[in-house]
Every structure is written in C-alpha cells, then in structure tokens.
C-alpha cells in the first residue's frame, strides 16, 4: 500500500494514484488534503486511472494509525531524515509505504510512530526528489523484493 500524508499538490497526488493503479497497489489518502478530490489538476494527473485504484481515505493520521495497527501492517516512512537506504531495507508484502507532504514532510510524532524509516540517498547538496518520483522508486523496489512485479507482468492487459 502507498499512503499519502496530507498531500498538498494535486498533480503529485494524481500521479501517485495513477502509479498505484498501474502496479495494482492499494492507496490511502490521510486527510486533510490541500485540495478537493474534484480538483481538475488532480483528475488530469490521474487521468482515467483513478477509477482503477483501490483507494481508502482516512479523516486524520490518528484514524489511519488505528486502522494500520488493527490490520497489523508495518508502516514504512520514506523520509529525508532517515538513515537506512531503501535499497538495504527488506520489504514485506503487507508493508504500507508512507509519503509525507510535499511542502513539509510529516510531523515528528508521525515520524516517530513509523515502524521503519528509509531514505533515497542523494548527492550533496541535493535535499529531495519530487514526491511522486520518490514514491515510484521505492514502491518499485518494494514490489521487486516481494515478487509482485512478476504478477503485474502476468496480469491480462486491458484492451484499447
């Protein structure tokens, strides 16, 4: 699952949901988002793929965290403050990859509540990648590790 913490740029959110649709990954939006889901930029970035995403919405991080604990899934935060490279981390099929806000990441309390934290190594003085690019990189590695990419490749293709 790819979870988006209070996304504030509709184009990035739409792009990440499109990524989830294409790879068969569940998605969650942790409210409040910085835009309505009817936003034209959000819909345009997601194109007609948004209807193909298994999407859940949570009214707050507290509600999301309660759901996450109840389901027993591990919360893996992608953070520029983490020390473990995502390529050295062992992902599990039921992991939830949490992406922070484009403008501010996540608050310290959310950071501390994650079961694990991973980082994409960048050369100095670069600070971060676009959140949708970062999500694609780490989600791709997680799916590769758990063998889920092969399932995507074996799935029947939609007709044009």
UniProtKB/Swiss-Prot annotation:
<dbReference type="InterPro" id="IPR016914">
    <property type="entry name" value="TrmL"/>
</dbReference>
<dbReference type="GO" id="GO:0005737">
    <property type="term" value="C:cytoplasm"/>
</dbReference>
<feature type="binding site">
    <location>
        <position position="120"/>
    </location>
    <ligand>
        <name>S-adenosyl-L-methionine</name>
    </ligand>
</feature>
<keyword id="KW-0489">Methyltransferase</keyword>
<comment type="subunit">
    <text>Homodimer.</text>
</comment>
<dbReference type="InterPro" id="IPR029028">
    <property type="entry name" value="Alpha/beta_knot_MTases"/>
</dbReference>
<dbReference type="Pfam" id="PF00588">
    <property type="entry name" value="SpoU_methylase"/>
</dbReference>
<dbReference type="GO" id="GO:0141098">
    <property type="term" value="F:tRNA (cytidine(34)-2'-O)-methyltransferase activity"/>
</dbReference>
<dbReference type="GO" id="GO:0003723">
    <property type="term" value="F:RNA binding"/>
</dbReference>
<keyword id="KW-0808">Transferase</keyword>
<comment type="similarity">
    <text>Belongs to the class IV-like SAM-binding methyltransferase superfamily. RNA methyltransferase TrmH family. TrmL subfamily.</text>
</comment>
<keyword id="KW-0819">tRNA processing</keyword>
<feature type="binding site">
    <location>
        <position position="128"/>
    </location>
    <ligand>
        <name>S-adenosyl-L-methionine</name>
    </ligand>
</feature>
<feature type="binding site">
    <location>
        <position position="78"/>
    </location>
    <ligand>
        <name>S-adenosyl-L-methionine</name>
    </ligand>
</feature>
<dbReference type="InterPro" id="IPR029026">
    <property type="entry name" value="tRNA_m1G_MTases_N"/>
</dbReference>
<dbReference type="InterPro" id="IPR001537">
    <property type="entry name" value="SpoU_MeTrfase"/>
</dbReference>
<keyword id="KW-0963">Cytoplasm</keyword>
<dbReference type="GO" id="GO:0002130">
    <property type="term" value="P:wobble position ribose methylation"/>
</dbReference>
<feature type="binding site">
    <location>
        <position position="100"/>
    </location>
    <ligand>
        <name>S-adenosyl-L-methionine</name>
    </ligand>
</feature>
<protein>
    <recommendedName>
        <fullName>tRNA (cytidine(34)-2'-O)-methyltransferase</fullName>
        <ecNumber>2.1.1.207</ecNumber>
    </recommendedName>
</protein>
<dbReference type="GO" id="GO:0141102">
    <property type="term" value="F:tRNA (5-carboxymethylaminomethyluridine(34)-2'-O)-methyltransferase activity"/>
</dbReference>
<comment type="function">
    <text>Methylates the ribose at the nucleotide 34 wobble position in the two leucyl isoacceptors tRNA(Leu)(CmAA) and tRNA(Leu)(cmnm5UmAA). Catalyzes the methyl transfer from S-adenosyl-L-methionine to the 2'-OH of the wobble nucleotide.</text>
</comment>
<keyword id="KW-0949">S-adenosyl-L-methionine</keyword>
């Amino acid at each position: 699952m790819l979870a988006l913490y209070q996304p504030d740029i509709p184009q990035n959110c739409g792009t990440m949901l499109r990524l989830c649709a294409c790879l068969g990954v569940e998605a969650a939006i942790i409210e409040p988002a910085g835009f309505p889901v009817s936003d034209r930029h959000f819909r345009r970035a997601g194109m007609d793929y948004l209807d193909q995403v298994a999407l859940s919405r949570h009214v707050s991080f507290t509600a999301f965290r309660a759901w996450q604990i109840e389901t027993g899934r591990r919360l893996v935060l992608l953070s520029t403050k983490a020390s473990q490279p995502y390529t050295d981390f062992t992902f599990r099929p039921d992991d939830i990859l949490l992406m922070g806000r484009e403008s501010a990441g996540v608050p310290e309390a959310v950071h501390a509540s994650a079961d694990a934290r991973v980082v994409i190594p960048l050369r100095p003085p670069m600070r971060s990648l676009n959140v949708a690019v970062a999500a694609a990189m780490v989600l791709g590695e997680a799916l590769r590790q758990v063998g889920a990419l092969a399932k995507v490749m074996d799935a029947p293709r939609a007709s044009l």
